[in-house]
């Protein structure tokens, strides 16, 4: 059994233990059944503004947030709890110094002036210093190898020969973009093009410092070695420019649990759902 299948089986076992009945694809009947608590008003509005695919069933598939393997559901279960609470314990667990200027955002939107919708960050924080912290969440996605033939960047990112990343103070990122497009550099497990788009959004929308977090659910397996090596290579190339912070959900949960400043029901839910062996 592959590591991804083992992870999906773990989620299915959790659902059954809660009296839930996932379908053959791992989707629950209702979004609420997949969450620690109902979506906050702010998170609900953010998902609705994003087109509704996370919340509404489609002809081809149920709403994405119904999936036991949903990365968005994982992020919501970790972060939406803090949207109306003192976030000091969360910031401490993330290694962030300072306090929030505004409530954290689920599905943070960072327009960059191009046509179409920019990719949403799973979580967006703005500190009192005006620094922006973007968090990209991954659950099972990184366990699937990326297709070499896929289009990494749409033509709009290069119209008129403008170097968007360099113009936004990210010359190392611009160099990496060029190497990706030419095929000089290839990443098999890490979705580097998505991270570079998020970095551009943060740079365009922040007049002060910003940082990009890559928060992922680690699974010991051969793919993890490749993934971690690609994280190292990416960090070596552009990490300083982005203040890039890779962090596992396992480590974040460990830090939150050790702080003794989070609600017991919240921690118990996360432990039984994601971290019980």
Predicted regions and their residues:
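Nuclease-adjacent, charged terminal/linker segments that flank catalytic cores
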Residues: 1-111
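Non-catalytic C-terminal interaction segments of nucleic acid-processing enzymes
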Residues: 12, 188, 195-277
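A short, conserved, highly charged catalytic patch centered on acidic carboxylates
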Residues: 123, 138-149
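Active-site metal-binding core of divalent-cation-utilizing nuclease and nuclease-like domains
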Residues: 100-128
